[in-house]
Regions:
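Catalytic Walker B motif of ABC-type/P-loop ATPase nucleotide-binding domains
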Residues: 169-173
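Conserved catalytic motifs of ABC-family nucleotide-binding domains
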Residues: 165
Length: 247
């Protein structure tokens, strides 16, 4: 059984039909890259998995560990172990790095107060583990998040999502706007997180960088899967890369 299975979903923004019978699966322990040109439906796919609205998922199912989560609230999906780092990062600029990381504890407590079952959740990941994964954040624990570089803010956004110890971490354009050296640092962190047991689903315009760390790749075009295979297969398939990714 796949950790995440998306089966034949149709998703809409209003009456705009974005995902058209899209199916994909993410296996536990892997790094899966979801690729495609701008407007192909990548972010819509992540939002559909995370329960964010819009889009409106009208047909098909999303299952996580065999449970149907298609119409669940975002908070309940997160409690089950699905984390999402959106493209906008959404760090709190007037709070320090450490205060941003502590917000995950507040989120967990709020869910408990709201009557959601958090009893089966793993404990929040210790800050020491996050600082080990992101040494730059360790050096800047007391620095305001708004004064961090773009790469450091991306690391903080990922670390904050990891604080909840998700089984599946979804990353929306983690390399956007980053210098090549910083991309290398973020890549190293993603691979380290994966080695420690967190499954990764990422979408990325920098196809070469994403393919270089992925185990499995999907390409979507106009809301449909047009390639599904191992990353090594896509590295060797120049025709498919040029046709759908322009690389």
């Amino acid at each position: 059984m796949s950790l995440l299975a998306v089966d034949d979903i149709d998703a809409y923004y209003g009456e705009s039909h974005i995902l058209r019978g899209l199916s994909m699966a993410v296996e536990e322990g892997e790094i899966c890259a979801l690729l495609g040109r701008n407007g192909a439906g990548k972010t819509t796919t992540l939002r559909s998995v995370a329960g964010a609205r819009p889009p409106d998922v009208r047909d098909g199912t999303v299952t996580f560990r065999g449970d149907d989560i298609t119409q669940m609230a975002t908070e309940d999906i997160a409690i089950r172990g699905v984390g999402l780092v959106p493209e906008e990062r959404r760090v709190f600029p007037n709070l320090t790095v450490e205060e941003n990381l502590h917000l995950s504890e507040v989120s967990r407590n709020a869910s408990n107060t709201a009557g959601r079952d958090v009893g089966d959740l793993p404990e929040t990941r210790p800050l020491s583990e996050l600082y080990e994964a992101f040494p730059r954040l360790d050096e800047r624990q007391n620095q305001l998040a708004g004064t961090l570089s773009g790469g450091e803010q991306q690391m903080l956004a990922i670390a904050r999502a990891l604080r909840q110890a998700p089984d599946l971490l979804m990353l929306d354009e983690p390399y956007e706007g980053l210098a090549p050296q910083i991309i290398d640092d973020v890549e190293d962190a993603i691979e380290r997180i994966n080695d420690e047991g967190t499954t990764i689903l990422l979408i990325e315009q920098n196809a070469a960088a994403a393919i270089s760390i992925a185990d499995q790749c999907y390409i979507i075009d106009q809301g449909q899967v047009v390639f599904d295979g191992e990353a090594e297969e896509l590295r060797e398939d120049e025709e498919t890369r040029k046709r759908y990714l322009g690389v």
